[in-house]
């Protein structure tokens, strides 16, 4: 299982493998494979499409 990957800007945020740790804790990636979706901690890491 790959670790959580970081999401960049607010608009069109996507997941990246290169960044191991996120600068902002609220933005983290989905657990699903091949999913370039970002999640927010407030809603139990629910996935949102951008």
Swiss-Prot record:
Keywords: Chromosome, Developmental protein, Differentiation, Disulfide bond, DNA condensation, DNA-binding, Nucleosome core, Nucleus, Spermatogenesis
Tissue spec. comment: Testis.
Example GO molecular function: DNA binding
Predominant localisation class: nucleus
Record Pfam families: Protamine_P1
InterPro entries reported in the protein's UniProt record: Protamine_P1
One GO location term (cellular component): nucleosome
Lineage: superkingdom: Eukaryota
Subcellular location: Nucleus; Chromosome
Single biological process term from Gene Ontology: sperm DNA condensation
Function: Protamines substitute for histones in the chromatin of sperm during the haploid phase of spermatogenesis. They compact sperm DNA into a highly condensed, stable and inactive complex.
Family: Belongs to the protamine P1 family.
Subunit relationships: Cross-linked by interchain disulfide bonds around the DNA-helix.
Name of the protein in question: Sperm protamine P1
Species this protein is from: Saimiri sciureus (Common squirrel monkey)
Designated gene of the protein: PRM1
């Amino acid at each position: 299982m790959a670790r959580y990957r970081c999401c960049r800007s607010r608009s069109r945020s996507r997941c990246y493998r290169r960044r191991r740790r996120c600068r902002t804790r609220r933005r983290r990636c989905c657990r699903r494979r091949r999913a370039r979706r970002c999640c927010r901690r407030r809603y139990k890491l629910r996935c949102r499409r951008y």
